Curated annotation (Swiss-Prot):
Annotated family: Belongs to the bacterial ribosomal protein bL17 family.
Protein name: Large ribosomal subunit protein bL17
Organism: Coprothermobacter proteolyticus (strain ATCC 35245 / DSM 5265 / OCM 4 / BT)
UniProt KW keywords: Ribonucleoprotein, Ribosomal protein
A GO term, aspect molecular function: structural constituent of ribosome
Length: 117
């Protein structure tokens, strides 16, 4: 039974999946939006929303969790000082997934993930 089992495997082992989500979240913080396949976009939304929730609290433990996932202090600073304050009065829904069509080569559904504000 699959009770309370959530998340997508994305055709990867655990380490590769975590590395993929970290890379996509770094690119989201740097560029403000990322274009990828739809399943990856949906997982990135979950991952990035949790990072913003931690960044909003500004407690030491939460900042260290964000740094653990992003791996770069400059990105943590950008997330906590520029991005998180935009969502001070909002509880969740920090990112938006917009479907953009299908990839030409293999027909995979693609989507753009961007900040909602």
């Amino acid at each position: 039974m699959k009770h309370r089992v959530d998340g997508r495997k994305l055709g990867r082992k655990t380490e590769a999946r975590i590395a993929l989500l970290r890379t996509l979240s770094k690119q989201l913080v740097i560029h403000g939006e990322v274009e990828t396949t739809l399943p990856k976009a949906k997982e990135l939304k979950r991952f990035a929303d949790k990072l913003v929730t931690h960044a909003k609290s500004k407690e030491l433990h939460d900042i260290r969790l964000v740094e653990k996932h992003l791996g770069d202090r400059e990105l943590v600073k950008k997330l906590t000082d520029e991005i998180a304050p935009r969502f001070a009065e909002v509880n969740g829904g920090y990112t938006t997934v917009l479907k953009t069509g299908f990839r030409k080569g293999d027909g995979a559904p693609t989507a753009i993930v961007r900040w909602s504000k």
